[in-house]
Amino acid sequence: MSKHRLTQNQQRRINANHHKKITRSKFEWQDDMLGEIQAGTIVTRHAKHADVEAENGEIIRCNLRRTLKNVVVGDHVSWRKGSQQLQGISGVIEAVYPRHNELSRPDYYDGIKVMASNIDQIIIISAVMPVLSLNIIDRYLVICENAGIPALIVLNKIDLLSEQERQHVQQQLAIYENIGYQTLCLSANTGENMDKLDRYLANGTSIFVGQSGVGKSSLINQLLPEVHAITGAISDISGLGQHTTTASRLYHLPQGGNLIDSPGIREFGLWHLTPEQITLGYCEFQTILGNCKFRDCKHNTDPGCAIKHAVEKGLINPIRFENYHRLIESRDETKSQRHFRT
């Protein structure tokens, strides 16, 4: 007799019930077993626990109070240390302080998922293999603009390019430099321009984002050799990288600054954003918006569109304009196909 394969929803219900059983049987801290409230920062988020860095640099694995539903790497928290370690846990997180900002992405089942918080800079990692996608870069930039977090575009694996190919890539990156974004070409393999990346990362907290296979783990191995992040090969079939990071982590860099490494994301969806928010994600549109003939202008075939007129005059790059409409269209298609919880 053949075995029936569980559907995604069935598997999720089984996992949820298993988690509830574990939670009910999990040790509960009593108040008299806990010390004074301290300040700390979340440096690793696990499924059921989180690692907190105390002000003295000590890393403590903690339970979360049941009232805390969404704790992420980068959060500043208040926590209390236990009188002893119990079941591998040494403390409990009591509360999360207000966030300066947060980086979120949509999840097909769980609505908006916050990935990290209190970020000073988003490092968008792209690569020349299998192909440099400006559409994906634009997708990330829309997220950065809506989150209000500065972005640095990093192109890895340039050692694979010929001199002619490098010149072509520089022309593509100039599209972003001309509208105020910083870009950097480097190679984690040869170390080319890694010193420049060090300088960009030296202040504040940065986060690496990018599709799997662009070399985020290889870059971390260069920046932090002692970490030995697992690197993955490119799939010969799909051309996509294999996921190599399983949990978001915050690292302290030797030259100063902090780095958050997040799991590889093959599709950073935008269907949680409105078309207006995607439009606001294009920084070069901002001085022109409001000048269209019609207030509900879709910036496509509408008569009197100021954005389209700016493209025709060479004030807005046509590749960016084309990608803008591709993002709007892909958002509408994806949202109509998925039951998305907001």
Curated annotation (Swiss-Prot):
Keywords: Cytoplasm, GTP-binding, Hydrolase, Metal-binding, Nucleotide-binding, Ribosome biogenesis, RNA-binding, rRNA-binding, Zinc. Its cofactor is Zn(2+). GTP binds at N156, K157, I158, D159, G210, Q211, S212, G213, V214, G215, K216, S217, S218. The keyword Cytoplasm applies. Residues 100-268 form the CP-type G domain. GO terms for molecular function: GTP binding; GTPase activity; metal ion binding; rRNA binding. Signal peptide: none annotated. InterPro entries: G_CP_dom, NA-bd_OB-fold, P-loop_NTPase, Ribosome_biogen_GTPase_RsgA, RsgA_GTPase_dom. GO terms for cellular component: cytoplasm. Pfam families: RsgA_GTPase. Gene3D superfamilies: Nucleic acid-binding proteins, P-loop containing nucleotide triphosphate hydrolases, Probable gtpase engc, domain 3. Its EC number is 3.6.1.-. One of its GO terms (biological process) is ribosomal small subunit biogenesis. Binds 1 zinc ion per subunit. Belongs to the TRAFAC class YlqF/YawG GTPase family. RsgA subfamily. PANTHER family: SMALL RIBOSOMAL SUBUNIT BIOGENESIS GTPASE RSGA, SMALL RIBOSOMAL SUBUNIT BIOGENESIS GTPASE RSGA 1, MITOCHONDRIAL-RELATED. HAMAP family: GTPase_RsgA. One of several proteins that assist in the late maturation steps of the functional core of the 30S ribosomal subunit. Helps release RbfA from mature subunits. May play a role in the assembly of ribosomal proteins into the subunit. Circularly permuted GTPase that catalyzes slow GTP hydrolysis, GTPase activity is stimulated by the 30S ribosomal subunit. This is Small ribosomal subunit biogenesis GTPase RsgA. It comes from Haemophilus ducreyi (strain 35000HP / ATCC 700724). The gene is rsgA.
